[in-house]
Amino acid sequence: MTRSFRVEWTDGRKMADDKSNSIGDNSTNKRLWSSSIRGSALIFICALLAEPARATTHWVVTEDGKIQQQVDSPLNLKHPHHLVLFMQQETRVNYLKKLEKQLVAQKIHIEENEDRDTGLEQRHYKEDADCVTAKVPLGDLDLYDGTFISLESKDINPEQFLDLMSALPPDLEKPDCAKLLDLPYSIHAFQHLRGVQEKVNLTSPLLSKDDPIFTSLCLKLGQSVDEVGHRIHQALLKNSSSWVLYNLASFYWRIKNEPRRAVDCVVRALHFSPRQHKDVALVNMANVLHRAHFSADAAILAHAALDLTTDLLTSHYTLGNIYAMLGEYNHSVLCYEQALQAQPGFEQALRRKHAVLCQQKLEQRLEAQHRSLQRTLNELKEYQKQHDHYLRQQEMLDKHKLIQEEQILRNIIHETQMAKEAQLGNHQMCHMGQQKFTLHCPFDLPVRYHRGELFENVHYIQFGEEVSVASSVALVSELSVNESHSPQQSYTVSLGREPAAHWDKETTTTDESRTVLWPRRSDCAQRFPTIPPAYLLPTYYLPPESRNLKALNILLESISPPPSAKMPDCSLKNVVGNRDPLESMSWALEKELRDPQAAEVLLKRSGGRSLEQTGALIAQALEKMSGPRWMMQNEAGLFWRAKGNGTQALVCLRQALHSAPPQHRDLPLVNTANLLLHYGLHSEAHELLQQALQINQSEPHTLLSLVNVHLSQGNLTGALAVFRQALSLSVHCGQCRASLPLMRCLQFYPFLYNLQHQACSSGGACEVEEDSELEDWDTGSSSSGRQEVWDSDAMPVSALEDSLLFEKVVVDSNGSGEASGQDRTREPKAEGGEEEEQDWRLREELIGAFEGALDMNGKTGDLRGIRVLKNDRVMGARGGGPCFGNCEDDEGAEWITFQVKRVKKPKSDASEGWVGEGDVRQTEPTASNSILEISGPTIPSPGPSERWKDYSSLGWPGPEECQRTRRVDLTTVASTWLAVSAKNIDITEHIDFATPLQEPAVEPVCNANLPASMHTLDHLSGVANRGGIHYTGESQLREVLQNLGKDKFPSQSFEQVGTRIAKVLEKNQTSWVLSSMAALYWRVKGQGKRAIDCLRQALNYAPHHMKDVPLISLANIFQNARLWEDALTVARMAVEIAPHFVVNHFTLANVYIAMEEFEKAMHWYESTLKLQPEFGPAKDRLRTIQCYLLSKRDRRAP
């Protein structure tokens, strides 16, 4: 059980001063001072007791009485010595707690008041009395029910107006009122209504068979409707002014459901009707316009009919239908009631009245629900604003908070150091005697060592005696970095001639030179967290002075200042032919991109003149032919580089390339290459630098420019090799010092940048690196014997975390300043199997304290802790391991090694094949291949290590290729899944696929209340707030789950596999494999909280080198939930754990795409293709990004 308490600081010096000042006072003052202090202390204690809620949980007291920091405490700061920042952080923590309580209360209020009545409409229809009476909703009633006022009700017999005795012709005619009479515009005919004016566009729904309009024409008028229409037409030919005939014609056209012709007839009927009979035509027209969806016009006509008619039933009923359709429910009900007064018990009016009342009350209830939902929406928006504010405050909190992984590492290192001191005592450097029978140790302290071939003859250990160690071999180095046996003790490093001795050292102080040449790891991580993009790398200018030609300032001294500030113009001088390959690159240099290094060089070369003054002088020199023209064009190119005008710079440099003498062509070649590289054209720059090296191979500017090309292409190993070659040149280079900070960080801390050596092929020989200046600092091969003293902070060996990153440092153990170098050629390990096995067993005997992974001499092991140090000769190494930078084996050197636990690797003759992108390929036999499974695009396994170097760069496409390239929708999330088979785990050994299922289906359940630890990543907001994330699920992974164990058992349904996982997970909650499978199940189901619960459980129990399996799933969930920062964090962790898996690189690239970090996404798609050059999805996405950037003309190198 732990107890939380608060720690308060006081200023000890102030208290001491107060106490010393009070000594000389009288006893009264002493008593007053003591009483005041006691009173203040009492008040302070009472205040603490009165406010227990303000106590923080930064410090805890463990069960064994130890006081320690909590790993996930927000008060673990990057700068723990900063008291003010600590207090501000505590205030921010308390504020966030209050804000969190407010958010929770606000969310509860929203949920309690949220209207979740989804069955309102159905319940209303069942419970409302009007709805029950109406029997059906208003929408199911025919509100276009046809009505008319019969002529018989006007005491008019239609038979008297028709000739019923005449014979009928074979072709019956139809009454076309518009042709029979050309009616002038008449307001009395309501021709001003919009429905009448737009009669040609009138439409009408189909008539039901029961529509009353079919009874408007009496059967006595004819045997069929067409016969009646013919007789009406004949009658109108004889009497074209009869309002009765026009009304009959309108009845005919209403039956035919042709509203345009009906309007033509009814308008003429209105024109000729007497006032007392106009209601017949008005009701007719109202029905026609109502059915044609001009209900507002129909209402006007129906009201006009009410003023004239005696048939109130028909007019009110018609008007009620019209108002119901218009949504004027109150008017509609009033009209239906008037109709019922005219004819009580009229069922059609009664049902419609109740249906209208039912609909009116339903809409009122729906409007009330809408207002409630709108209020809830506004509250949610306000909640979102508060939540965003909370996240911003959390970001400010995390800004100063120490990264949890780093705090865990510090705790591990501390615990390891404490364990070493407890178990092995204080550590010291011991040496083997010349006869190899004794060990000489300076202190009488316990010594432990492993017996082996080199020291099995040791019979005793001699303590404290002064011995000469110049020719002895350092066997054990376990010197504690926190202790020293004398105040004067310090580490010394044997140094030869200083690296980069000719590189403008006079411009830097000793401290600056020391900081640049011997950087600390923390400085490198802060200054260069990643390899800078091409436009941020230093650029170089190869000056003519390197060929003993006239310098720029000498050429400019002979020229008088020009009267006007002109710019150098190279476009009209010595025009280069159209076949120049550099001409096609000018479009890529259109964007303004200043080169600060070029501006600095030009300022120094021009004697302090301003940029504009220098440009004017160069322009005047070009016009007056002062000096060789190609040299001035070279200087003009430098000017335009400083101005950021790449197009003009390229024009000048092309002219210089065309006119320069062959022996001096490397000057414009190198300068042009630096221009192109600054704009990201690293492939083209590489080609120009290769041409320059053919002319002069000993020019450091050329080599360092080539270093930048390799860096921009991601070839860090190649960059280091060329950098060593440049260091070996004893040539003055005033600009070269700009490359030192980054390159020295790459040399000393290669694993900070994921730098790895490619393994030699089995049949080929490894290239032996030449001796260079780089090794002088660690081998002490120079005869000068100069030494430098390093403090413990700057010494890499004092930082145990550096050893965790597999870095090696060399410390001179004898102080002589001299040591013999050994051949660094890597020997093939074809016949040394027995020695390697003994070598491995010796490493295996070491014990450890924490987890990791290590690959040494082709054997894989689990890293379990750190043990300081064994000399390579003691360990039996033969130089076959990875080597970066300083590779010489010094007999007096100490090496950081690791304690490992051996893991046997399964033997296989060949890896499984993979299918992707429409073709099938069987990979070459290799023991290190891993099979990856992924849903979305199929992710193949990486090929053998010999094939990795086949891919260098995809390059940038041209406009034609972009037009041909199939574009990929980058907003589509490709779900990824790292199968446990990639970790050589057989899933059928964990899940029972053979036993038939008898019981009903169940779902896997993980421990949702698993305590937070250093492994569960609860410091991420997505994990801590997993119950509130918006996760839509990844149903595309269903097939992956169904095919688990497909090699041995047939595919099963999704529910069956979930049940099998649930059965075994219930018995074994500590299996990270089963927890990962359960998380995959919940990813398919779309339940993010349950999936994260299972992934927390998997992360808690998984070994470190297996954690990338749940981390990839977690990254996909965060990306789906749009928690991109969290997704980025866990995806990076997965890549760091297993950088050789394609799926990890591809997932990280996808996260950067979602964040619209296109250049970073391109980098990781490139790294994906380096692992698997034929992987189509990465190629397609990379091409899509490139074409998008090119279309914006805003390209920078990846």
UniProtKB/Swiss-Prot annotation:
Ranges of biased composition (kind: Basic and acidic residues): 821-832
Swiss-Prot/TrEMBL TPR repeat ranges: 313-346, 630-663, 700-733, 1071-1105, 1108-1141, 1142-1175
One Gene Ontology term from the biological process aspect of the record: actin filament polymerization
Pfam family, one: TPR_2
Keywords, in A-Z order: Cell membrane, Cilium biogenesis/degradation, Coiled coil, Cytoplasm, Cytoskeleton, Membrane, Repeat, TPR repeat
SUPFAM superfamilies named among the record's database cross-references: TPR-like
Localization terms from the record: Cytoplasm; Cell membrane; Cytoplasm, Cytoskeleton
InterPro entries linked: TPR-like_helical_dom_sf, TPR_2, TPR_rpt, TTC17
Ranges where the record places region Disordered: 771-792, 814-839
Cross-referenced SMART domains: TPR (SM00028)
Domain of life: Eukaryota
Outcome of gene disruption: Morpholino knockdown of the protein causes curved body, a lack of defined brain structures or necrosis in the developing brain, and eye formation defects at 24 hpf. At 48 hpf, show a reduction in number of ciliated cells within the olfactory organ.
Gene Ontology annotations for the cellular component aspect, listed alphabetically: actin cytoskeleton; cytoplasm; plasma membrane
Coiled coil: 358-399
Family named by the database record: Belongs to the TTC17 family.
Main function: Plays a role in primary ciliogenesis by modulating actin polymerization.
Protein's name according to its UniProt entry: Tetratricopeptide repeat protein 17
Origin species: Danio rerio (Zebrafish)
Lineage, top ranks: Eukaryota, Metazoa, Chordata, Craniata, Vertebrata
Annotated gene: ttc17
